[in-house]
Amino acid sequence: MNNDIEFFIKKFNVSRETIEKLNIYNDFLLENNKLLNLIGKTTEKHVFSRHFKDSAQIYNLIEDKSEIIDIGSGAGFPGIIINILMVNDKIKGNVVLIDKSPKKCKFLQDLSNKLSLMLKIENIRLEDYKFSKISTVVSRAFKKTVDTIDILFKNNEKIRNIILMKGKTYQQELDDAKKKYTFHVEKFRSITSDESYILKISDIKLTTT
């Protein structure tokens, strides 16, 4: 058995149907990658380990799955993977994928239809999206931490949780964000890269001067 598929079975107790959805996702992603540049060419042979597994690791960090917003979704990471696992677990909740590229949004909608997912695709600038106070925001390979908080805080000061998937500059990004905001942060080492971390940020407030 493929080690990456075994990971999903052991970690998330996924069904055969869910494994089939992941395989469909893999094939459709590769089929569209040349045209849309969804993932780096060097990762095309490692979609499960580099992208699917990486995205799935934040699933259990999302305590409230009633509304999840994936910002800068692009190829659907991590939002599509999260929604696939929610369907596997029969968890109801709203999942929204936001991306400013019309072509990538069409890819996401076509993929959602292929996988029979119930999610919403928003072709909109993040600055123009109105967040609910119950939203949990997730992102992977998006803007710098302080820039992300700037946009989210401006749109809704009551967002509960932000889960950011970051590379080796995560600490510098946190330090920069703390110059402008106070917040609670939990750090989790990535299971796919020793240099990467997941940041779970909450209780955000502007620093008073």
What are these regions (language model features)?
Residues 1-64, 69, 103-106, 110-117:
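Class I SAM-dependent transferase core
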Residues 109-110, 149-152, 175-176:
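Short amphipathic alpha-helical segments
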Residues 56-134, 139:
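Conserved SAM/SAH cofactor-binding pocket of Class I
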Residues 159-170:
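Conserved beta-strand signature within the Rossmann-like core of class I S-adenosyl-L-methionine
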Residues 149-161:
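A short glycine-rich, Lys/Arg-flanked "PGG" loop and its adjoining helix->strand segment in the class I
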